Amino acid sequence: MPHRGWTIPAGHPNYEVNNTYEIEEDIFLLSMGPHMHYRGKAMRYELEYPDGEREVLLWVPDYDFNWQFLYEYEEPKFIPEGSKMHMSWWFDNSEANRFNPDPSQDVVYGPETTDEMANARIYYAPTTPRGLVVGEQIPDDIINRAREEDMIRRERADLFDPAADDFSWLTEDSP
């Protein structure tokens, strides 16, 4: 889940970026993977249950771009529909950050390591079986529903460009 549309001011030692994602169905959370670049300082995943109770799922207080881990649960964690995943990232764009390529510049989201990212990978499985069996053909209704759900997620994340990605590449024989 990338989060865009923010600018880290030049010289700022502790800039905070926040995003929230609503869980739309019951899921089993399998793992999480924070991702930032050289100015990344800390990252937190916090879950708000439908009843308002909150739980910190992952806190990485000393993020290091060179040590990006995928944090896995020993047993999948059940998360009910309607829960909200609150994600917070902190960045150090100051001269005190020895990894900072240029503390005199404002920084925005971008693909280069000299840009920044506020990404929160989550890997999960639905609790309800999808009706997919290894080795059997995937029914058209499941493929169509997956395409629709993917477009909704991309639009919500401001990633979908219909002109660039029309799913014409997707066929039954796709790997």
Residue ranges with predicted function:
Residues L132-P175:
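Activation corresponds to long, low-complexity, non-globular regions
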